[in-house]
Amino acid sequence: MLLNVMPVNHLSLLVIFALTLLVSKCVIASELIQPQYLDSERTDRFFAREIAQPSKENMQLRNSLDWGYELELKRASDEEKLVSNCQDLATANSTGFTAAKAYEYGAFKAYLTQCQTWSEMAKLAASKRSFISDFKLDDTFPNFAPSALAFVISDESAEKAKTLSTWDEADHIQRTQVISEVRAEYYDSTDGFQVITVTAKGDYNADGIEDIVIEKENSVLSGSYSSSHGYVLTRMSEQALFTVLAEW
């Protein structure tokens, strides 16, 4: 009986090819920039108990994770509701519920922003290239940040911001105080006080470029006004201006 035996040299070439392909895949995987979740301090303040550090695997779970306490909500019909996780909060908001007390409205909106931020962070994937590897929150950031970050308190100021290129052009930042690598305070020329927090980095829109997720808290030094906002920013070179991929 004749056996169809593959020549040894052909078999060796196949083995070498397979090993080369495997090594190439490993090299490509190792070169990918994995998402970074940087909001551990905010998480510790948000939940009444210790939870796992943020990761790709558990980010989406935060929608249903119990906070350890309840928020009281109400809607126009005087119907009341208690919520204790992000998923229930979003559902209640979509059906007309808001803060039960007027003075709690700012906190209610801040909770919505934080929950939405976690949902957006869950969309991040590994990136192939980064133009924010050396990014820092410092006094130069307003010169590169988009005008969408402007402290908007009226329709007029919103329209004006749309005609400008950078955040600094809109708000004329006068002073910066860096709190940590992921948080800084910015003071503008009209008594506005804004806190920027970098919550995550990763590829948000599947273009292979690393993007950055931030939250911005607005307040007035001489008043009680406050608002919270979230953004995904990106840029196409180290010195390019940031553009907005998503806003909430």
Q: Where do the model's predicted regions map?
A:
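Bacterial N-terminal signal peptides that target proteins for export
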Residues: L2-V15
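Beta-propeller-forming repeat regions
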Residues: S30-G202, K216-W248
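Acidic/hydrophobic-patterned starts of short beta strands in beta-sheet-rich repeat architectures
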Residues: A206-E217
